[in-house]
UniProtKB/Swiss-Prot annotation, chain B:
GO biological process: cell differentiation; female sex differentiation; negative regulation of centrosome duplication; negative regulation of Notch signaling pathway; regulation of Notch signaling pathway; regulation of protein stability; regulation of vulval development
A Pfam match: F-box-like
UniProt tissue specificity: Expressed in tail and head neurons.
WD repeat segments: 253-291, 294-333, 336-373, 376-415, 416-455, 461-498, 501-539
Biased composition (Basic and acidic residues): 1-11
InterPro entries on file: F-box-like_dom_sf, F-box_dom, G-protein_beta_WD-40_rep, WD40/YVTN_repeat-like_dom_sf, WD40_repeat_CS, WD40_repeat_dom_sf, WD40_rpt
Gene Ontology annotations for the cellular component aspect, listed alphabetically: axon; cytoplasm
PROSITE patterns: FBOX (PS50181), WD_REPEATS_1 (PS00678), WD_REPEATS_2 (PS50082), WD_REPEATS_REGION (PS50294)
Start and end residues of each F-box domain: 121-167
Purpose: Probable substrate recognition component of SCF (SKP1-CUL-F-box protein) E3 ubiquitin-protein ligase complex, which mediates the ubiquitination and subsequent proteasomal degradation of target proteins. Regulates synapse elimination in early development in the motor neuron HSNL. Cell autonomous negative regulator of lin-12/Notch-mediated signaling, with respect to lin-12 activity in cell fate decisions and tumorigenesis. May target the intracellular domains of lin-12/Notch proteins for ubiquitin-dependent degradation. Involved in sex determination by promoting female development.
Protein name stated in the entry: F-box/WD repeat-containing protein sel-10
């Protein structure tokens, strides 16, 4: 990064990120630092304050636009936060702040995509909150409740369905 | 799906009906056409075109359809779906709403079952394993057991050792490997005329259980060792709390005498007696290994060194003797005390002994050398604790003294008790001392405080002598000659629970597991308590002679075994040690 102009405050860089489906999201420089993958990508591809305006958006081919928008929103909210230590014990003592609890109160499909994205983009804070959210869905539940919450058949039901499909295939 | 199949069957089986449905479809189609023209007045020409093009197509299908196709498709449903596809998203939503209003609850429930999976995700099966592990990392062992029952995939992920290893110390309590406890005295049981063990397994079930006990490492251990460890620890806890007692034994010795002291180290049990001897027993084999002969007076106190190599005993003959656990040989006789050796404590190979001669002496048991004499008490020393540097002693002079073991200097004298001090606890890390006295009170001291201000709590409520105490964190458990167990918060200085049930003096106490305390009593019983709920869990041993002289003098325990020293002062009960087994195998 170049030195800021002496007489004017440095403008913060805003990066454009293009997702797998062609949707463009924006993230500030500070927000991007929450993601080790994005930070490395920006550095390796040579995006700078001088050339950012003239270059194509940063390509992230593993994440769709809807999910990337959520990621960007989370990173902007937490851009001033320290990145949590890479330590399993952090997870045990972690409590999810209220804003994040609301942010993560989304459908399973969206939460699933968000956790995958946080893993790919190496956003530890979001990954921990996402995993903790799923943990909290499972905590203190009976086996039957777990199946109902996560939409999982018993192995017997799966076996019966497979048998039925095989029988149907033979008839056809 | 099923109702639709049903309709199909009806359709296919009635040839005369084939014509009527066609007629019905035509009528319904006209109705829908009318509706369409109402809701889309501006595009009536388009609808008219649709109508004219659809009609011939439907007609063609009707004429050319084979009987099997007729069975597969319900023309009315197909028409409905075709119309539905032509609707806008908003129109579809309106149609859904109105269809639901026309549906019965059975169909609505089936509809929910079809829809719900669209909103659910099987996270553990679909996420990368390392993320699944992060999710499971937050769960308790109990939760993990439930997770394992959900599906094959969940079971595989839930059994990854790293997840179980990460459980906290509270959950992942380590026990020594499973024991045999089927030979020697274990071949019988402790159940006998005059001895009741209320929840003991029936004799006819013992042989099967003994066989199963020897299968020490099961299937789960082979594929998920740490889960197996968790399950075993959980089983052991249940064995103490609720399960039938699956094994017991009687160690007979010290006939017609009192067992005055008892210690356990790993698999070694040492009992001392006023018959002038100590016996060294192998717990798992259920047999005596050595009888330590040499004292010329009753043995009143003993210790096993932390390394397990030395047994030390104190006697009315004024001597301290050091014995080898390897072969029971006498290594040293330590002389110097001028009266009964009444109490002792060890740290490493350094021993501190307290005596009726009012002094404490410091020894090295390896070399047999006398290192220091601590003068200061004005009456018998009754109890002592030692952390390797600091000695804490309580005496019949009503005081508790703090000493430096190396210099022999008395650092502090704690005054406040107005009768003899009988029991002590010392927690070195916090400089906390708890003392129990015949004045009925328990005092909690912090001797780093300014002189005269050391007493941080005065615990009152007991009405007699406190015979034993144990402290964890801020919770102190005390047992007393008044027949009660009390649970205290030493930070608040309050009594949290009073546990009643014994009918005479409590002689000993053992705290194991998270919240379980066992107590022995002059009333001839051993009771197990839950000190968190403040309730009796169950009686473990009951002597018929209780109340007539039979008593339980002392308890010792490991995490899987309880030893009870039994006897009487009037020969109504033979002297023996009853062992109860609470062990379990790795599933």
């Amino acid at each position: 990064m170049s030195a800021p102009i002496v007489d004017a405050p440095a403008a913060e860089i805003v990066y454009k990120i293009i997702s797998s489906d062609g949707v463009v999201s924006k993230m500030s420089e500070k927000a991007v630092q929450q993601s080790k993958t994005l930070s490395n990508l920006i550095e390796n591809l040579g995006y700078t304050i001088e050339n950012i305006e003239t270059r194509d958006p940063i390509p992230v081919t593993n994440v769709n636009g809807k999910t990337m928008a959520k990621v960007a929103e989370w990173c902007e909210k937490h851009k001033a936060d320290a990145i949590p230590e890479d330590n399993m014990n952090v997870l045990k003592t972690l409590t999810i702040p209220e804003w994040d609890q609301k942010f993560l109160k989304i459908e399973d499909e969206a939460l699933f995509d968000l956790i995958l994205a946080s893993n790919f983009l190496d956003i530890k804070g979001l990954m921990y909150f996402g995993c903790k959210t799923v943990s909290n869905m499972a905590k203190g539940k009976t086996t039957a409740e777990l199946r109902e919450i996560f939409g999982i058949n018993t192995d017997e039901q799966d076996a019966a369905e497979e048998t039925a499909q095989r029988a149907a295939a033979e008839v056809a | 799906m099923w109702p639709r199949n049903d309709v199909h069957m009806d359709d296919g089986s009635m040839t005369p009906e084939d014509q009527e449905p066609v007629t019905d479809n035509d009528m319904e189609y006209n109705d829908n056409g009318e509706e369409s023209s109402y809701s889309n007045g501006s595009s009536s020409s388009y609808n008219a075109d649709k109508l004219s093009s659809s009609r011939p197509l439907q007609h063609k299908l009707d004429l050319s359809a084979s009987p099997s196709r007729n069975n597969d498709l319900n023309p009315r449903v197909e028409h409905l779906i075709a119309l539905f596809k032509d609707l806008s998203s908003a129109e579809q939503m309106d149609a859904f709403t109105r269809l639901l209003q026309e549906s019965n609850m059975t169909n609505i429930r089936q509809l929910r079952a079809i829809i719900e999976p669209h909103f659910q995700r099987d996270f553990l099966s679909c996420l990368p394993v390392e993320l699944g592990m992060k999710i499971l990392h937050n769960l308790t062992g109990y939760d993990l057991l439930k997770v394992a029952q959900v599906s094959k995939n969940w079971k595989l992920i839930s059994e990854i050792d790293k997840i179980w290893k990460s459980l906290g110390v509270e959950e992942f309590k380590h026990h020594p490997d499973p024991t045999d406890r089927v030979t020697g005295a274990w071949q019988g049981t402790a159940i006998a005329a005059g001895v009741t063990i209320p929840d003991h397994i029936q004799p006819c079930d013992l042989n099967v259980h003994r066989f199963l006990k020897l299968q020490k490492f099961g299937d789960i251990f082979e594929r998920a060792a740490d889960k197996s460890r968790y399950l075993r620890a959980d089983k052991i806890e249940k064995n103490w709390n609720a399960n039938p007692i699956m094994g017991s034994a009687v160690l007979r010795g010290h006939e017609d005498h009192v067992i005055t002291c008892m210690q356990i180290h790993d698999d070694v049990l040492v009992t001392g007696s006023d018959d002038n001897t100590l016996k060294v027993w192998c717990i798992d084999k259920g047999e005596v290994m050595y009888t330590l002969v040499g004292h010329t007076g009753g043995v009143w106190t003993s210790q096993i060194s932390q390394c397990g190599r030395y047994i030390v005993s104190g006697s009315t003959d004024r001597t301290v003797k050091v014995w080898s656990t390897v072969d029971g040989s006498l290594l040293h006789t330590l002389q110097g005390h001028t009266s009964t050796v009444r109490c002792m404590a060890m740290a490493g190979s350094i021993l501190v002994t307290g005596s009726r001669d009012t002094t404490l002496r410091v020894w090295d048991v390896e070399s047999g050398r006398h290192l220091a004499t601590l003068h200061g008490h004005h009456a018998a020393v009754r109890c002592v604790q030692f952390d390797g540097t600091t000695v804490v002693s309580g005496g019949y002079d009503f005081t508790v003294k703090i000493w430096n073991a190396h210099t022999g200097r008395c650092i502090r004298t704690l005054t406040g008790h107005n009768n003899r001090v009988y029991s002590l606890l010392f927690e070195s890390e916090r400089s906390i001392v708890c003392s129990g006295s015949l004045d009925t009170s328990i005092r909690v001291w912090d001797f780093t405080r300014p002189e005269g201000q050391e007493c941080v709590a005065l615990l009152q409520g007991h009405t007699s002598l406190t015979s034993g105490m144990q402290l964890r964190g801020n919770i102190l458990v005390s047992c007393n000659a008044d027949s009660h167990v009390r649970v205290w918060d030493i930070h608040e200085g309050t009594c949290v629970h009073m546990l009643s049930g014994h009918r005479s003096a409590i002689t000993s106490l053992q705290w194991f597991g998270r919240n379980m305390v066992a107590t022995s009593s002059d009333d001839g019983t051993v009771k197990l308590w839950d000190i968190e709920r403040g309730a009796l869990i169950r009686d473990l041993v009951t002597l018929d002679s209780g109340g007539n002289g039979g008593c339980i003098w002392r308890l010792c325990s490991t995490s899987t075994m309880l030893a009870c020293a039994v006897g009487s002062r009037n020969n109504t009960e033979e002297t023996k040690v009853i062992l109860l087994d609470f062990d379990a195998v790795y599933p």
